[in-house]
Amino acid sequence: MYETNMYEGMIAETVTMQGANGDTINAYYARPLGTGPFPGMVLVHHAPGWDEWYRETTRKFAHHGYAAISHNLYHREGQGKSDDVAAKVRAAGGVPDAQVIGDTEGAAQWLRAQPWLNGKVGVVGTCSGGGHAFLFA
C-alpha cells in the first residue's frame, strides 16, 4: 500500500540481455533503490511494440517495490519509432512464438542473475503480450 512518507527513488535504464538463440537484445529495467531483495516482474509488450507505455509501466512496478524488466521483442528488426518498427514486424508476419518465449526466458534469467532479486519472478503482458505471457507461464 502506498504511504505518503515513502521514499520514491529508483534506478531505471536500458540494458542488453541474451534473448532467444543467444541473440543480444535490449530491455528496459527499473527497480527501487537499495539492496533489496525485490520480487521480479517481466513485462511482455503488445503488438504495437516496445513503446513509452511499457517504460512507464516498468517504472510503475518499481515504484511499488518490484524489479521489473521489459524486453524489446522487435530488437532484431532495427531501431526507430516504435510504430514504424511494429509496422515492419507486422508486414513480415510477426515474431514467432518460440522467439518471444525465448526472449521472455532471457529476461527472466537476467532478473534472476541480479543480486538484489529475491528469487521470485512473475510475468505480465497486454494485448498479444498477454497471450505470450500465458504461453510462457
Feature map (PLM): residue ranges:
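Non-catalytic accessory segments flanking enzyme active sites
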Residues: 1-2
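Serine-hydrolase catalytic machinery in alpha/beta-hydrolase-like enzymes
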Residues: 5-6, 14-116
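Histidine- and/or cysteine-centered catalytic micro-motif in compact active-site loops
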Residues: 10, 74, 126
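Short structured motifs
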Residues: 10-16, 130-131
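Active-site signature of alpha/beta-hydrolase-fold catalytic machinery across serine-
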Residues: 56, 135-136
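Aromatic pocket-lining residues of Rossmann-like dinucleotide-binding sites
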Residues: 61, 136-137
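Alpha/beta-hydrolase fold nucleophile elbow
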Residues: 114-126
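Gly/Ala-rich beta-loop-alpha elbow adjacent to hydrolase catalytic centers
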Residues: 125-129, 133
